[in-house]
């Protein structure tokens, strides 16, 4: 009887198992029916993963260029892979992982390098914005620290220069008078991305600075201590690359000495077009830094890394300060470092040098006296009309010093990079644009078109600027400009 009972129980278990198997299918499993290693073409490629399973599974390891249509599921399914075109000459690979409770499989995808790409030739140029056939203000933009793969049509080089161009015009009065400008790009290949840290382009070293050398076209370098924003490059090479643009070819190639002083060539002729042109060097580095080198003849190079800092320390804000403010506007800084009077000599700013530069029409955003009839000429119409422009007056402190030097408004782009040129700054820029375009400026025209700039004034509030930086961040003023060719 006992044996019969045991036999019946065993038969019952077998029946249950059989029923279970017939209702639930086979044991849990996961298989990949397609290839687990495959290669695709550089363009117009696709792929798939054929999953055979009766359990839940996931797919991980997606990249920007190789993405599965789903990242999880259950049961059998063919998962399509989206594979973007390879826009470099270099092959690339990705590994996707299909995993479940029953194990995992690696799917290895490789893509060929693209041999069909067209790269800009070294030293070539492109006219990207032609608003005038004659009497235009010229802007030449080039990049440093961009390798050959970046130099495709619409590639990283073009995208960076596009950002620079739009940033320059994204402020009044440049926005309103954009149709007075022509813009050109010049292409240069670097062997490495980035910029040099801790060395000047001439190979000189700096102290207390983490050093890293990059082989770049224009030898852009961050040249001072770790907390400095000072920047340099091979100025002579930049000037002569700008001359690759046909309209810039007046005169002979430029020769500078080791300190950047003019020796010969176009830059020594005050009437040469190089001295009426804005040159922007976009540096392919994320550091917050930037410097403008300004020549007494009018030439300039604004050096701007592609800062990833927020707010008024961004790439765009830095470029507007360095290029629009220093380079085109020829303005002095308005921030304050020292709680003392502007010295008569020595340092980056002093009264003697300021007076000399103002004598040739530069640094007219600051005043050495707080007396109306001694203020720069571009201040005069504002001071004469306090009802229309009540914000303009004498505010002590500029050029890194708290006393003995005055700015025209409480705040402006030359203080903390805020997107706002104050009244006298904007009027100077307007007059320069009109003059370089062989047109006659007038106070009446400026006022008639000034409403858009006035609306930007609300952005000049320092509290608003600070809030835009984010919690715990403090605005860092940019290094003073480099002055070459001091007036005698």
Regions found by a protein language model. Name each.
Residues 15-37, 101-103, 108-117:
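Bacterial Sec-dependent N-terminal signal peptides
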Residues 90-102:
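A short beta-strand micro-motif common to beta-rich folds, especially ectodomain repeats
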């Amino acid at each position: 009887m006992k044996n019969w009972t045991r036999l019946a129980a065993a038969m019952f278990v077998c029946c249950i198992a059989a029923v279970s198997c017939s209702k639930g299918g086979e044991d849990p499993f996961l298989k990949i029916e397609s290839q687990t290693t495959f290669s695709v073409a550089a363009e117009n490629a696709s792929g798939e993963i054929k999953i055979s399973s009766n359990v839940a599974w996931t797919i991980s390891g997606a990249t920007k260029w190789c993405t599965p249509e789903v990242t999880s599921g259950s049961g059998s399914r063919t998962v399509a892979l989206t594979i973007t075109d390879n826009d470099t000459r270099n092959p690339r690979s990705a590994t996707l992982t299909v995993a479940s409770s029953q194990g995992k499989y690696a799917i290895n995808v490789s893509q060929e390098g693209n041999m069909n790409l067209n790269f800009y030739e070294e030293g070539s140029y492109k006219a990207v914005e032609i608003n005038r056939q004659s009497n235009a203000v010229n802007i030449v933009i080039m990049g440093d620290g961009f390798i050959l793969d970046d130099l495709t049509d619409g590639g990283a080089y073009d995208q960076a220069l596009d950002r620079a161009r739009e940033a320059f015009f994204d402020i009044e009065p440049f926005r309103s008078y954009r149709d007075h400008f022509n813009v050109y790009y010049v292409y240069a290949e670097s062997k490495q991305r980035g910029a040099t840290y801790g060395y000047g382009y001439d190979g000189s070293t700096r102290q207390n600075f983490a050093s890293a050398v990059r082989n770049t076209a224009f030898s852009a370098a961050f040249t001072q201590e770790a907390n400095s924003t000072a920047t340099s490059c091979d100025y002579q090479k930049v000037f002569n690359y700008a001359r690759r643009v046909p309209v810039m070819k007046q005169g002979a190639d430029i020769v500078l000495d080791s300190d950047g002083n003019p020796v010969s060539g176009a830059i020594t002729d005050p009437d040469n077009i190089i001295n009426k042109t804005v040159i922007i060097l976009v540096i392919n580095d994320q550091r917050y830094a930037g410097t403008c080198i300004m020549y007494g003849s009018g030439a300039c190079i604004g050096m701007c890394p592609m800062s990833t800092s927020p707010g008024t320390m961004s790439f765009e804000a830095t470029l507007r300060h360095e290029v629009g403010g220093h380079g085109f506007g020829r303005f002095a800084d308005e921030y304050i470092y020292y709680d003392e009077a502007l010295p008569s000599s020595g340092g980056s700013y002093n009264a003697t040098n300021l007076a000399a530069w103002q004598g040739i029409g530069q640094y007219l955003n600051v005043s050495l006296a707080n007396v109306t009839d001694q203020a720069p000429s571009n201040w005069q119409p504002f001071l004469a009309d306090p009802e229309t422009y009540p914000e303009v007056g004498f505010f002590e402190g500029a050029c890194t010093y708290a006393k003995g030097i005055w700015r025209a408004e409480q705040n402006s782009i030359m203080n903390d990079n805020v997107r706002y040129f104050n009244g006298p700054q904007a009027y100077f820029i307007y007059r320069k644009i009109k003059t370089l375009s062989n047109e006659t400026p007038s106070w009446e025209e400026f006022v008639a078109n000034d409403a858009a700039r006035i609306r930007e004034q609300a952005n000049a509030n320092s509290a608003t600027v600070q809030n835009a930086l984010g919690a715990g961040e403090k605005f860092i003023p940019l290094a003073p400009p480099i002055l070459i060719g001091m007036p005698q």
